[in-house]
Regions:
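Predominantly a Rossmann-like dinucleotide-binding segment in NAD(P)-dependent oxidoreductases
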Residues: 107-167
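Rossmann-fold dehydrogenase core element
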Residues: 89-107, 127-130
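Rossmann-like NAD(P)(H) cofactor-binding subdomain of soluble oxidoreductases
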Residues: 59, 79, 102-109
Length: 167
């Protein structure tokens, strides 16, 4: 179990403070800059044990790097980074620092995914020769990003989201 005790919840200091207050985070542990948070929390005797990175994809590498260098364990939302070279650099840094780095793959916990994995491992369905997957999510079916919706803006830009959305 984890307790939320600190956070860099927005790059806007007022919004970060308001979000922290809503979540019960002490004002002195509310940050508007992830690098500042990494250094400050690493210096505290009661500093965080781990950070959860749930930023837009293009920020994962920078944020994870700051916390790994500060000696703070990282729980990073998928994808690891927006590019393969960034992922390779991040993996090397995690190995070099020996600081735990874990990548969330949220669907691995779904019963249907676990059952499929079990069936494949046991040979119950034979050799897997082809996999076809559909991910039905209609909120980005139209040009939502044109309305200024923040999530849609970065998720529909391959330069910010990475190329995984196009695979």
């Amino acid at each position: 179990r984890w307790e939320l005790v600190a956070g860099a919840l927005s790059s806007d200091p007022a919004r970060a403070a308001a979000s922290a207050a809503d979540l019960g985070i002490a004002p002195e542990r509310s940050y508007s800059d992830f690098a500042q948070m990494a250094l400050a929390e690493a210096a505290r005797p009661d500093g965080i044990d781990a950070v959860a990175i749930v930023t837009p994809n293009h920020l994962h590498a920078k944020v994870a790097t700051a916390f790994l260098r500060a000696g703070i364990a990282v729980i990073c939302d998928k994808p690891m980074t927006a590019t393969l070279p960034e992922a390779e650099e991040l993996a090397a840094l995690a190995a070099e620092t020996s600081v735990p780095f874990v990548l969330t793959q949220t669907y691995t916990g779904y019963p249907m995914v676990r059952e499929a994995r079990r069936m494949i491992a046991e040979g119950a369905i034979g050799a897997v020769r082809h996999v076809q997957v559909e991910y039905l999510q209609d909120w980005l079916a139209g040009p939502v990003e044109q309305s200024g919706q923040k999530q849609a803006v970065w998720r529909t830009d391959p330069g910010l989201s990475g190329e995984g959305g196009c695979i």
